[in-house]
Every structure is written in C-alpha cells, then in structure tokens.
C-alpha cells in the first residue's frame, strides 16, 4: 500500500516530453519559458521603438511642412512688402514731381497775383486822372494806357534807354498816394518815355510819348534762374513768363467784377518780346499804329450807309 507522501508527490509531479518529471513551481524557471518571455519582451520593445520612431518621423514631417509653409508665407509677405514699397515709391515720386511742378506753376501764379493785387489794381484805375493832372504831358501822351514790358529772358534794365537808346525818359506823371500795408500815403508813380520816329539827322521827327515800364516781378524770375537752389532752368523760366502773362491777363480782365473801383480794362497793354530780335521802340509804335488802324476801321463800319 502506497503512502500519502508518495501519492502527494505523484500528484504534484508533471512529466516532460523526455520523461523527466518537473515539479510544480519549477515550470517558470525552464529555459523554454524564459526564452519565450524574452522574445515577447523584445518584440514589445521593438514595437515601442517603432512607434517612437514613427512619431518622431511624423513630428519631423510636420515640422518640415511647417517650415515649408512658413517659407511660402514669408516669401508671400516679402513680395507684398516689395510691391507696396514699389507702389509707395512710385506714388511718392509722382507726388514729388507733381509738387515740384505745382511749385513752379505757383511761382508764376503768385507773382501775377502779387503784381496785380499790390500794384496794378491800385494804379491803373487812377491812371487817367494822373494824366489829366500833368501839365507837361496831358496833351502829349500818345495812348492813355500803361505799356507793361515782358522780356522773354526776364532781364530788365534799370533804364529802358539802356535796352533801346531811342526810348528816352521824359519825366514822371503826378504820383498817387495810397495808404497801404500800414504805410501812410505810400507813393506810386509812372514814367513817361519819348520816342522820336523816324529820327532825322537834325533830331526832328514825329514824337511819341508812352507810359511804359517793365513788369518788375520778372526780375524775381530772372534772379531765380541764376540762383542754383531755386532749380529754375532757363527754358522753365521762359515758360514761366508765359504763365505769368496768362494769369495776369486773367486777373486784369476779371477786374470788371470789382464794381468799377478797380476796373483795369483798357488801361494797360502787355508787351511780350524777345530782346535778341525785337526793339522796344519799334514794338511800341507798331502797337500804337495797329490800335489806331483797328479804331479807324471800327469807325468806318459804324458810319451808316446813305
């Protein structure tokens, strides 16, 4: 009869394929099980590493995509900035040119306004009265108007006789005294010049007496054309004379709107000329003769037909 210990030992024993029994508790320490666990652990580690590698690769791809996107965005922004800078530069250059041109135009406009407002509108309405007050010239004045000389070069002589020896100073009209700019009885006066045409050897000939003077603002344009900082070239200066004459004519003709007090119409004549080709005496007499011819033709047309 088998003992209890023998039976217990038999129950707790297991048999290997080779017939060698393995007791319970010794199974986990067998080489086969240990290797299996090692393989499983290694496989798990490999999977974890692969996941980590994939995640790292994904992160790097995301970072690379972000870099590419940023580069594209940066390039786009740079293009926009460059376009805006170019546009701004174009606008600034255009504005600058416009301002420069406008400034040059404003020179002519400003001079014309100043000449009209500060001088012509004050003296022209009084011109006929000053002529009538002159005992010396009241019956000699050829035309009761002020001839305003506008030389193309803007150069003005202190004495008109220096520009044309046939135009000689004969005297002044009575002065006008006007309160102006805080100055009491400021003096304004006009010079009368005599021209003898044609001058015979004995000095005789037909005498003309003109109230004539230079447009003094042209002296400013002349000085500007000689002053480097003014940046006014000779061709631009010549153009400014035309603009000055145009604006001055506009202002003088619109003086009719001043309720008669400053009406300058018919009391002036602007005389533009090229000093290299024209002589002042010839121009003045030609203007006078043409005006008389037109006047005579108008009178003939006004005579009723019998």
UniProtKB/Swiss-Prot annotation:
Transmembrane segments: none
Binding site for 2',3'-cGAMP: 119, 180, 186
Entry annotated with the keyword Nucleotide-binding: yes
Keyword vocabulary terms for this entry: Immunity, Innate immunity, Nucleotide-binding
Domain of life, source organism: Eukaryota
Signal peptide residues on this chain, from the entry's feature table: none
GO BP term, pick one: activation of innate immune response
Molecular function terms from GO: 2',3'-cyclic GMP-AMP binding; cyclic-di-GMP binding
Keyword Mitochondrion belongs to the record: no
Region annotation Disordered: where it falls in the sequence: 1-50
Gene Ontology CC terms, in alphabetical order: autophagosome; endoplasmic reticulum membrane
PANTHER family with a match to the protein in the record: STIMULATOR OF INTERFERON GENES PROTEIN
Function: Facilitator of innate immune signaling that acts as a sensor of second messenger signals produced by cyclic GMP-AMP synthase-like receptors (cGLRs) and promotes the production of type I interferon. Innate immune response is triggered in response to nucleotides from viruses and bacteria delivered to the cytoplasm. Acts by binding cyclic dinucleotides: recognizes and binds 2'-3' linked cGAMP (2'-3'-cGAMP), a second messengers produced by cGLRs in response to nucleotides in the cytosol, such as double-stranded RNA (dsRNA).
Similarity remark: Belongs to the STING family.
The protein's name in its UniProt record: Stimulator of interferon genes protein 5
Primary gene name: STING5
């Amino acid at each position: 009869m088998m003992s209890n210990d023998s039976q217990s030992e038999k129950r707790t024993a297991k048999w290997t394929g080779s017939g060698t029994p393995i007791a319970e508790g010794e199974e986990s320490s067998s080489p086969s099980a240990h290797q299996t666990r090692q393989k499983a652990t290694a496989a798990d580690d490999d999977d974890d590493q692969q996941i980590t590698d994939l995640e790292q690769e994904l992160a790097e791809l995301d970072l690379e995509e972000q870099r590419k996107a940023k580069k594209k965005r940066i390039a786009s922004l740079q293009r926009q900035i460059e376009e805006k800078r170019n546009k701004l530069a174009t606008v600034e250059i255009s504005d600058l040119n416009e301002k420069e041109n406008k400034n040059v135009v404003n020179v002519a406009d400003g001079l014309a306004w100043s000449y009209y407002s500060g001088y012509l509108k004050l003296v022209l309405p009084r011109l006929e009265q000053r002529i009538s007050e002159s005992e010396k010239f009241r019956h000699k004045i050829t035309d009761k108007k002020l001839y305003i000389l506008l030389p193309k070069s803007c150069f003005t002589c202190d004495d008109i006789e220096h520009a044309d020896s046939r135009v000689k100073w004969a005297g002044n009209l009575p002065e006008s005294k006007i309160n102006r700019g805080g100055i009491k009885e400021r003096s304004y006066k006009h010079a009368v010049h005599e021209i003898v045409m044609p001058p015979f050897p004995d000095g005789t000939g037909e005498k003309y007496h003109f109230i004539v003077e230079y447009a003094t603002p042209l002296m400013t344009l002349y000085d500007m054309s000689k002053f480097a900082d003014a940046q006014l070239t000779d061709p631009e200066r010549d153009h400014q004379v035309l603009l000055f004459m145009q604006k001055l004519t506009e202002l003088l003709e619109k003086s009719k709107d001043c309720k008669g007090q400053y009406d300058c119409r018919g009391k002036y004549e602007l005389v533009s000329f090229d000093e290299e080709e024209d002589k002042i005496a010839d121009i003045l007499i030609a203007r006078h003769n043409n005006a008389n011819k037109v006047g005579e033709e108008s009178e003939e047309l006004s005579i009723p037909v019998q």
